[in-house]
Amino acid sequence: DDFKDLGFIDKQKAHVKEAVSKLTARSDSSLAGFVLDMFCTSMIDVAKELGVPYYIFFTSGAAFLGFLFYVQLIHDEQDADLTQFKDSDAELSVPSLANSLPARVLPASMLVKDRFYAFIRIIRGLREAKGIMVNTFMELESHALNSLKDDQSKIPPIYPVGPILKLSNQENDVGPEGSEIIEWLDDQPPSSVVFLCFGSMGGFDMDQAKEIACALEQSRHRFLWSLRRPPPKGKIETSTDYENLQEILPVGFSERTAGMGKVVGWAPQVAILEHPAIGGFVSHCGWNSILESIWFSVPIATWPLYAEQQFNAFTMVTELGLAVEIKMDYKKESEIILSADDIERGIKCVMEHHSEIRKRVKEMSDKSRKALMDDESSSFWLDRLIEDVINNLS
């Protein structure tokens, strides 16, 4: 169950209240409030008991936040239920999106009754917050952010304060396996390598791995491929490394591609995206990975797996024109095998050196860095947040 850990969080309320009470008792400072992840909204009760406001740090994009508010609103006002759209070809008109949203990219967990209602409870908690910090920036998601600001339903103040990324000290974080990867990249020409990496819970079994291998070999592009074992079906666990990658890959693949590619297990994603040899990124479209790829000006080919990643892929490809599609509505539980031809097509497209998408990603990369500078958009919203937190104390 995707939501089994929420019960565990709920059980920590008494402990959190005790810890915070002790902390404030020994300090001359007053408690300004709580900052909560959306899945920790059970801690709202603790904030209320302590008589302080709470704020949400939303780690996905503004378009998805707007989608959540829309879903909860039509449920509460019209008794609409997203589960009716399972396996549907319908399209939804969502205020935070400029284009109609295909039902096929809805998060799978929201198409199951009990999980859908758990989401509704969470979103109601978001509406009661004093403010919501979103890990995005105005120049990236202006339509979504403006729609949230103009929404007539009860939505708290929104603060686009991103991109918030962990970028520093990468040379100290990569470890021995990472160092070997970076040394290999040092020998590759600029923007010549396509990087395939699918997040902490992304992995593939032998059948899909063979199609990816075939696509890479056919594409004739240099590649760095982080290939990991998928979590057990139905389990929310991180991927693990294969003991022997050669048992998963086609016979002779490593020998035939020895001069053009490297297959590894775990890989230090940020340090790799930062490397000048990387020219494209086949990604699961986790929001952090999207922000990292934009920051380092690396275009994405979308291959979402779980959570809201299909929605993110739609946002990047259709809404923003910042990515190419391999498969926008792929879901890891579907057991569909993507063909080598489809994967190869996406790789060739994302690696085009003078494409419009590459140009747009470079422009957005510059904007993402500028947004964090003094007096620019995200800096402005961070200042506004601090002012509002101080004002809410009185």
UniProtKB/Swiss-Prot annotation:
Pfam families, sorted: UDPGT
GO annotation, biological process: anthocyanin-containing compound biosynthetic process
InterPro entries attached to this UniProt entry: UDP-glycosyltransf_plant, UDP_glucos_trans, UDP_glycos_trans_CS
Superkingdom per UniProt: Eukaryota
Signal peptide span: none
Binding site for an anthocyanidin: A307
Active site: residue positions: D37
Main EC class the enzyme belongs to: transferase
Binding-site list for UDP-alpha-D-glucose: T59, A267, Q269, H284, W287, N288, S289, E292, E308, Q309
Pathway(s) where this gene product acts: Pigment biosynthesis; anthocyanin biosynthesis
Disulfide bond residue pairs: none
Keywords assigned: Glycosyltransferase, Transferase
Tissue-level expression: Expressed in cotyledons and leaves.
Family, as annotated: Belongs to the UDP-glycosyltransferase family.
Function noted in UniProt: In the presence of other necessary color factors, this glycosylation reaction allows the accumulation of anthocyanin pigments. May be involved in glycosylation of unstable cyanohydrins to produce stable cyanoglucosides.
Protein's recorded name: Anthocyanidin 3-O-glucosyltransferase 6
Species annotation: Manihot esculenta
